[in-house]
């Protein structure tokens, strides 16, 4: 049974992906206890708020530039966009194209406080903030750092009926960061885990495409 075999492969990969995620987060928590330097997120990283091209203009949509809404941030990794926009849509709206491996956070709505990682270059809507890698600290630090910080960040800032945080809340939040040597030692361990996890996540994307092709061919 071809479909069953594909489903088994996807399920096996998902089990490993979740285990690797737990290893990453545990390693981060274990190592970060030793880090003494405290800085604001915005002093180290560029934080970018997304936007939405006007839905009244058809020429802004269905192009070849990936765009994700905050609902996608609910996923462990973002491998596919919600929609596609055009170059005109990108240039005539507040959205920005974020490179893959950008850590993204949902700042309002049902997915408030969710953190994910882009596995594709993509724009986002205005309910999402992207935190870009800098020259020294990469996604293997930023992503687990945000997973660790987000609960406190949200609790500090959400008041009354308006359940949201803003870009300034993220930028002014203080975190502990490793020295260059500490980060090198940490990254040597964690980066290969991220790479293997990413490989499995993208493999699952291909397996799903294969499954859908098979279903269309024989049952379409």
Please place each PLM-identified region on the residue numbering.
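Extended hydrophobic-aromatic, low-complexity segments
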Residues: 115-116, 139-141, 153-155, 182-186, ...
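Non-catalytic DNA-recognition/assembly elements of restriction-modification systems
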Residues: 1-52, 62, 67, 176-220
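A short beta-sheet element
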Residues: 69-70, 86-148, 156-159, 167-168
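Short Gly/aromatic-enriched secondary-structure transition segments
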Residues: 58, 83-84
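Low-complexity, Lys/Gly-biased intrinsically disordered segments
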Residues: 36-76, 91-94, 158, 166
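Short amphipathic alpha-helical signal-transduction/dimerization elements
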Residues: 7, 147-150, 154, 194
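Cytochrome P450 core scaffold surrounding the K-helix E-X-X-R motif
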Residues: 76-82
């Amino acid at each position: 049974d071809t479909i069953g075999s594909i489903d088994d492969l996807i399920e096996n990969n998902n089990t490993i992906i979740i285990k690797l995620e737990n290893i990453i987060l545990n390693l981060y928590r274990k190592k970060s206890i030793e880090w003494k330097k405290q800085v604001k997120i915005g002093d180290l990283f560029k934080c970018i708020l997304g936007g939405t091209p006007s839905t009244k203009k058809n020429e802004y949509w269905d192009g070849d530039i990936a765009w994700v809404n905050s609902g996608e941030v609910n996923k462990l990794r973002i491998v596919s966009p919600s929609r596609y926009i055009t170059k005109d849509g990108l240039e005539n709206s507040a959205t920005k194209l974020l490179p893959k491996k950008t850590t993204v956070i949902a700042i309002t709505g049902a997915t408030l406080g969710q953190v994910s990682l882009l596995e594709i270059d993509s724009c986002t809507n205005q309910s999402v903030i992207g935190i870009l890698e800098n020259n020294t600290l990469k996604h293997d630090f930023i992503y687990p750092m945000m997973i660790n910080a987000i609960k406190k960040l949200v609790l500090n800032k959400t008041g009354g009926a308006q359940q949201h945080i803003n870009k300034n809340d993220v930028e002014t939040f203080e975190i502990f960061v490793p020295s260059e040597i500490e980060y090198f030692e940490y990254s040597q361990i964690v980066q290969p885990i991220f790479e293997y996890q990413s490989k499995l996540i993208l493999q699952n994307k291909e397996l799903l495409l294969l499954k859908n092709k098979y279903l269309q061919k024989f049952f379409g």
